């Protein structure tokens, strides 16, 4: 029977969980603020990890840019903490990437809600 998930998928899920906890509890950089780890993609050799993040309540590009700089600066520290909590031969090099999809999804949801309201108003007026 074949496995449902590759090892890299399982490691990526664990990294997502652990990095989220580390960002919440250990990283004290004020530039980072409320950050959410939305996804992790890891290379097949487990040497590199792309960590996709979003910043809650902040859509300002300057705040996002400062937050990303804070994450990049904290990356070695996060990697060392990750190495302590996960038993991996090689702890992947972390690369943080801003995930625009959550913001786009919220914007699309708001647009749909507004269109539905306008449509309901038209039907009530008729």
UniProtKB/Swiss-Prot annotation:
Record HAMAP family: RbfA
One annotated GO molecular function: ribosomal small subunit binding
Function noted in UniProt: One of several proteins that assist in the late maturation steps of the functional core of the 30S ribosomal subunit. Associates with free 30S ribosomal subunits (but not with 30S subunits that are part of 70S ribosomes or polysomes). Required for efficient processing of 16S rRNA. May interact with the 5'-terminal helix region of 16S rRNA.
Classification via Pfam families: RBFA (PF02033)
Family the entry assigns: Belongs to the RbfA family.
Keywords assigned: Cytoplasm, Ribosome biogenesis
Compartments where found: Cytoplasm
Gene that encodes it: rbfA
Top-level taxon in the UniProt lineage: Bacteria
Naturally occurring in which organism (per UniProt): Histophilus somni (strain 2336)
GO cellular component: cytosol
Alphabetized NCBIfam families for the sequence: rbfA
A Gene Ontology BP annotation from the UniProt entry: maturation of SSU-rRNA
Primary site of residence: cytoplasm
Entry protein name: Ribosome-binding factor A
InterPro entries noted in UniProt: KH_dom-like_a/b (IPR015946), RbfA (IPR000238), RbfA_dom_sf (IPR023799), Ribosome-bd_factorA_CS (IPR020053)
Subunit structure of this chain's protein: Monomer. Binds 30S ribosomal subunits, but not 50S ribosomal subunits or 70S ribosomes.
């Amino acid at each position: 029977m074949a496995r449902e998930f590759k090892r890299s998928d399982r490691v990526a899920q664990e990294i997502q969980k652990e990095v989220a906890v580390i960002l919440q509890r250990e990283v004290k950089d004020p530039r980072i603020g409320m950050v959410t780890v939305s996804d992790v993609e890891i290379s097949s050799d487990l040497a590199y990890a792309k960590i996709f993040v979003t910043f809650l309540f902040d859509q300002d590009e300057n705040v996002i840019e400062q937050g990303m700089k804070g994450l990049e600066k904290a990356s070695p520290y996060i990697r060392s903490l990750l190495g302590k909590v996960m038993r991996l031969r090689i702890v992947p090099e972390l690369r943080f990437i801003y995930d625009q999809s959550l913001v786009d999804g919220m914007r699309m949801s708001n647009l749909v809600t507004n269109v539905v309201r306008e449509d309901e108003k038209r039907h009530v007026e008729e």
